[in-house]
Amino acid sequence: MHCGLLEEPDMDSTESWIERCLNESESKRFSSHSSIGNISNDENEEKENNRASKPHSTPATLQWLEENYEIAEGVCIPRSALYMHYLDFCEKLDSQPVNAASFGKIIRQQFPQLTTRRLGTRGQSKYHYYGIAVKESSQYYDVMYSKKGAAWVNETGKKEVTKQTVAYSPRSKLGTLLPDFPNVKDLNLPASLPEEKVSTFIMMYRTHCQRILDTVIRANFDEVQSFLLHFWQGMPPHMLPVLGSSTVVNIVGVCDSILYKAISGVLMPTVLQALPDSLTQVIRKFAKQLDEWLKVALHDLPENLRNIKFELSRRFSQILKRQTSLNHLCQASRTVIHSADITFQMLEDWRNVDLNSITKQTLYTMEDSREDQRRLIIQLYQEFDRLLEDQSPIEAYIEWLDSMVERCVVRVAGKRPGSLKRVAQQFLLMWSCFGTRVIRDMTLHSAPSFGSFHLIHLMFDDYVLYLLESLHCQERANELMRAMKGEGAPADTGEELMLMSSTPTSTSPAPYSPAKSVHSVGVPAVGSPNSAQSPEYTSISATTGAVQSYTWSLTYTVTTSGGSPTEPGSQLSCMRGGPALHGSSSAHRMPVYPHRDEHGYTGSYNYSSYANQHHHAIQSQYSSLTHEAGLPTPLHYSSYHRTSAQYPLNSQMSRMESCLMSGSPLLHSSPVTPRWPDVPSANSCYSSPTVHASRYSTGDMYSPLAPRRNSEYEHAQHFPGFAYINGEATTGWAK
């Protein structure tokens, strides 16, 4: 924020006090040189101090500061002007004022984040308090020192008022809903992949993604780790067979692209918006931790699913880091671009650049140098020249960069499908070479505005990279969408054979992967590039043997003898690899997820609150395992409830909590039909260790559905078709 020299305010309330001080100082100066004067300096000081009948009161001063001033980003007040306000206050209160240094300490008690800047023209600069403004209700109110804008005086004497820079907070996006996810009716599913299960998974995953988005908006980034862990490690057993399908993996990739784009738009809607330092720090921390959280949450899941999740999350983290650094460069470049003197000097240096030589050197980097490329470089040169000449704001430069990428990359790649990466590489090479040549030319000629050009060059480079990375992510999502719909290649009807087949045999269990499964040989793992291989995955070759054991980290072990058919009550044969248990044909084991206690895993992800769903006979279709006789009692743990009071995304309005639609809290008007009813069997798959109950109480995560008091719904925000989000959350953004 640039502030110029601010004149002292002309206030009638202080004129008399200033005149009296001048008269008294003049009389003291005369009397000190008079031979008649017999009053010492100590007596004069004592007389001066005794003018006020009341001693100085710091609490009264703090109260006065609170009533008349407020924190405002980008507003400057001269230190002398604020001290004059304070002296006027002391005079009206008939109290003894403190000196300017002591008053500065009192101000910092009331406004600790206040900073001091020396502003003004050379030789006439003054100290200013930066970040404080006079309230409109104050008697000292002046538009120059208010939130409506800070004023400065340029060389021509023209006063301009700048817009106040308001720090952005993602809380303004509360209630944001995700765009539509893919519809199962539009997908080209293999015949052996049940459409019903895919539809159920999309519903579950949309709810999971919506929760992550809501958590990010409320700034509770640490809860994202818990949601990831509970969703993937608490997946219902009957949904596990579909996770390794290439179609479901593509669905996850498309949905993740939608989620990441929504999060990016919520955290930083535009790179030009000023962000608080606290928000920038938590965004960078979140981008750094997301990959580690996914490694833990996706432990022992199908390899192609892990790969697509890792690939998209790392691209998303890179874009977040790019946005934060770009935002910092934009704020620094704004002060340069909005200065008339700097832009005038930049224009002069820009026109002194040897354009012909730079153009020839740039064209050397092109594969096929053509005349239209030379004309394009000259056209871009002239457009930037016009922006400098018009002293355009930074928003105009951003629009120019957007149009440049649109003309040079998007339109060219649109004529040749699948060529986006190559076209972007060629443009980036030309752009980097031209910018480097310009900076080199200015360095050799000692251009006065070299520093400003260097800053603008950094900002332009980062913004172009940000646009190209965003285009690449969108292209990747489009590829996954085409593969999901079967437009690129027909769906492999044989890849889902494992859902209905008997259990193969092997001497040692291997982690489940469709690319290595006996029934899915030759099926490629769609969306699983080698560059995004999971560090935890270790390939184990499957061999033929007498006993094959398929386990899942959160379920029980099922063992079948080689050549014998699978028992009707056994688990399906596409569980995750784990340690083999030999002995009986049906073995029971404890949940073996290794990071359960460390990450507070409860072992359950309950979707029973979702209504308007068709009921399925899950108990008869997926029989539970028999309990081992060696264990005295079954394990009983509390479920991880997710109530429709918080996320009734798929509920009818009549089944939503009545208090969301009226002022009185009531229970549900009709019972909610559970999507998957709780099976009261002795060997329930999901468990919650007692240590979790002590570390994470139920109220910390999700409160049970119960009547609530009217006081709990104050300040609540309501959104049609969605649960309320309390605007006064415990953990919020720093204002």
Swiss-Prot record:
GO CC terms of this entry: nucleus
**Chief place of localization:** nucleus
Q: Which SUPFAM superfamilies match?
A: Winged helix' DNA-binding domain
Q: What are the entry keywords?
A: Activator, DNA-binding, Nucleus, Transcription, Transcription regulation
What PROSITE patterns does this protein's entry cite?
Answer: RFX_DBD
Question: Whereabouts does the entry annotate DNA binding, in residue ranges?
Answer: 44-126, 61-136
Q: Which Pfam families match?
A: BCD_RFX, RFX_DNA_binding
Under the GO molecular function aspect, what terms does this record hold? DNA-binding transcription factor activity, RNA polymerase II-specific; RNA polymerase II cis-regulatory region sequence-specific DNA binding
| One GO-annotated biological process of the protein | ventral midline development
Transferase among keywords: no
Its subcellular locations are:
Nucleus
* UniProt-annotated stretches for the region Necessary for dimerization: 315-487
Kindly indicate whether the keyword DNA-binding belongs to this entry: yes
Per the record, which residues fall in region Disordered? 25-59
Q: Which family does it belong to?
A: Belongs to the RFX family.
Protein purpose: May activate transcription by interacting directly with the X-box.
Per its UniProt record, what PANTHER family does this chain match?
A: RFX TRANSCRIPTION FACTOR FAMILY, TRANSCRIPTION FACTOR RFX4
Know the name of this protein? Answer: Transcription factor RFX4
Q: Which gene encodes it?
A: rfx4
